[in-house]
Regions:
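Glycine-rich phosphate/pyrophosphate-binding loop and the adjoining helix
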Residues: 4, 23, 27-29, 66, ...
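Flexible, glycine-rich phosphate/dinucleotide-binding loops
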Residues: 12-13, 42-44, 124
Length: 194
């Protein structure tokens, strides 16, 4: 089974560290993994021009083509975002909007895949829940089954407090516990339903 991870941070720092850690665990457990990082990439926002509705592809030619391929080939999808302005990054918002071109090909094109959310905030309550809710909403709109780590610490997904530092995120044992719980359920769903 294949898991596609999207690191929606414009930097190679805390969010990339967390999603890379998650993908390493999955790879060690026998999953094929692939990561797309937004750092250094160009993902332009959707123009809502409706070109995709008639032509079954997006008119914009940029690094989103790599995301389309990753989403289509994956059994599981992990969305990892830094919390920006209390929600997801602008990179992830553009990716979500541009997925419309896939839906224009087939409304059910992503249906039945398993989805997991990771949110990394500069402080403990910096908007991680709002970022998770946006990711979960995206999953539900596209028929992707959202998975959390369950109650008591990872209700919506894996939440981290980075204190805006790579050194500090490595000390976030609570965040790592939420990641481990969420990964456990993600693997269970992949093994049971895919």
């Amino acid at each position: 089974m294949k898991v596609f991870g999207i690191c929606a941070s414009p930097r190679n720092n805390t969010t990339e560290y967390v999603i890379s850690s998650a993908l390493d665990v999955l790879e060690n457990n026998g999953f094929e993994t692939e990561i797309f990082t937004c750092m250094g990439k160009t993902i332009r926002p959707c123009m809502h021009c409706d070109y995709c509705l008639e032509n079954k592809k997006c008119i914009i030619e940029d690094d989103m083509q790599e995301v389309y391929e990753g989403l289509l080939n994956a059994d599981g999808i992990i969305l990892a975002t830094p919390v920006q302005s209390g929600g997801i990054s602008s990179n992830l918002s553009a990716i979500m909007d541009r997925t419309r071109a896939l839906e224009a090909i087939d409304y059910n094109i992503l249906r039945g895949k398993i989805g997991m959310s990771i949110a990394v905030g500069g402080d403990r309550t910096g908007g991680q829940d709002f970022a998770h809710l946006k990711n979960i909403t995206y999953f539900m709109i596209h028929g992707i089954i959202p998975v959390s780590g369950g109650p008591f610490g990872s209700n919506l997904g894996a939440s981290f407090w980075s204190n805006d530092s790579l050194d500090d995120i490595k000390k976030d044992t609570y965040g790592m516990e939420s990641l481990n719980r969420t990964l456990h359920e993600f693997e269970n769903f992949l093994n049971k339903y895919i």
